A protein has these predicted regions:
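Non-Sec secretion/translocation targeting segments of pathogen effectors
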Residues: 123-125
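Short, acidic/polar N-cap/turn motifs at the starts of alpha helices
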Residues: 4-6, 100
Length: 125
C-alpha cells in the first residue's frame, strides 16, 4: 500500500479527517470502499460509512463501483472528484428511490486504500 488517501471534510459544521479502506462484496466480488474518520476522543480511526453501494445483478470492473449517493456525505464525493480520485462514467442504475452513478477510481486512490486485513497498528498511525 502507498501513502494512505486522507481528506478533510465538513459534516454538520464539524471538521472530520477521513481515510478509506477496501474490500469486496461477497456475492459478486465487486469493489467495496468504506470511509473511516479519526475519533478525537478515542484517538483512533473508526468506521464512518460506505462510499460504495452493491447493486443486484451488476458486475463492475475491478476499478469501478457505484457511489452510495444516498448515504455518503456529498462533500466527500465532491472532494474525491475534485482531486481526480473518481471519474464519472456517465452510467447510472436505479435502486429503490435512488439513482446511483458508476464511477472509475484512479490507480492512485486504489493504491492508497487500506484492506480489511491490514494491521490496526499500521492503520492507526
Amino acid at each position: 500500500m502507498n501513502k494512505p488517501i486522507e481528506i478533510t471534510f465538513r459534516f454538520f459544521d464539524e471538521e472530520h479527517r477521513a481515510r478509506f479502506w477496501k474490500s469486496e462484496y461477497a456475492n459478486n466480488g465487486n469493489l467495496y470502499v468504506g470511509v473511516t474518520t479519526w475519533d478525537k476522543d478515542f484517538k483512533c480511526w473508526m468506521p464512518w460509512g460506505d462510499l460504495t453501494v452493491n447493486l443486484p445483478g451488476m458486475k463492475c470492473e475491478p476499478n469501478e463501483a457505484f457511489l452510495d449517493t444516498n448515504n455518503c456525505a456529498p462533500e466527500i464525493i465532491r472532494i474525491l472528484k475534485d482531486k481526480g480520485y473518481i471519474k464519472d462514467t456517465g452510467i447510472t442504475r436505479p435502486s429503490g428511490w435512488c439513482i446511483y452513478p458508476l464511477v472509475e477510481f484512479s490507480e492512485e486512490f486504489l493504491n492508497g486504500l487500506f484492506e480489511k486485513e491490514d494491521e490496526d497498528e499500521e492503520y492507526n498511525n
